[in-house]
Amino acid sequence: MTHQPKVAIVILNWNGKRYLEQFLPSVTTTSYSDHQIIIVDNNSSDDSISFLEKNYPSLRVIHLSMNYGFAKGYNEALKQVAADYYMVLNSDVEVHSDWIQPMVGLMESDTTIAACQPKVLSYANKKLFEYAGAAGGWIDKFGYPFAKGRVFDICEEDHGQYDDVSFIFWVSGAAMFIRSSVFHEVKGFDEYFFAHQEEIDLCWRIQLAGYKLSSCPQSVVYHLGGGTLPRGNTRKTYLNFRNNLIMLAKNLPWLQKWWKIPFRIFLDLVSATKGLVIGDGGYFLAIVRAHLAFIKWVFFNQHKSVFPKRKNGDLLGVYHHNLVWDHFVKGKKYFREVVKNDF
């Protein structure tokens, strides 16, 4: 490779000193020559900044005036970063020193690929795929996200079964390697999302703009997960359900959204009712609040979330069936059981 693209590894932090202490040392071992590590601080109230000043004085820190969340936090920061590629990296991710090179090689070999992700394994159990992306994200016809190596809450062991580079629907927000030009072309993350599912929405818009997303399993990272909002947190449940509906309303063709969104709301309410029956009232209320917030968005904010769209053809990484039925009724636990010959 004659040209050595510039890579900016950008880590968003909010009151995450403990994660910086634990995971930043591995990132600083990155061996790719033309890279810069940038910490974006979402107005932390802990001593993250003093820790960085004392232990990593050479790292660039971008200070934001308030906690903008994941979406706007990155949008604000990346306006100030000049690089060929952005490595959007969660603060709770451990990496190998040579993790960047395979992704640069893949992206440089195919200019139609706008973003890719490494294989994401669990930091707690490094034999397992991790929930947030695993070996590359897919989506079903009703907007349920899943991944190669993770279907709903079931994460597979990694035996190299997904080690072939392949096109996917979405790239993990825990470790997203993206062309800076494309990120700005599609207007970055939707800031209304605040956090959760914003990377899937971004990747959907990237495909609508005519680009592709890919896995890059030759690069491997280890994600702790749940650093800011642990799984099961009602705030996380609310954001996931609200943002998923907004994403469908924004990106589905008109001929599909009129029936898919009501059916998706029905499926959500089935899940909420199940939560109520087993005594999880918080889960039930979070979904109801998410639906009310979605209705509010439709009436008052939908016009603010208009992004360029150019492609109407088939999207890659879409499972054109009902994942809920296949998983919970037919008992298909793993990606290969669900998708079979479609990847």
Which ranges hold each PLM region?
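Active-site-adjacent helix/loop segment of glycosyltransferases
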Residues: 10, 209-329
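Conserved donor NDP-sugar-binding/catalytic core segment of glycosyltransferases
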Residues: 93-144
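Short aromatic/hydrophobic "clamp" motif used to bind/position activated sugar donors
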Residues: 86
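Glycine-rich, basic loop-to-helix element that forms the pyrophosphate-binding segment
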Residues: 63-81, 91-93, 102
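A short, conserved alpha-helix in the catalytic core of glycosyltransferases
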Residues: 163-220
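A recurrent flexible, glycine/aromatic-enriched loop bordering the glycosyltransferase active site
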Residues: 137, 141-147, 152-178, 200-202, ...
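Acidic helix N-cap motif at the loop->helix transition within catalytic regions
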Residues: 21, 46-54
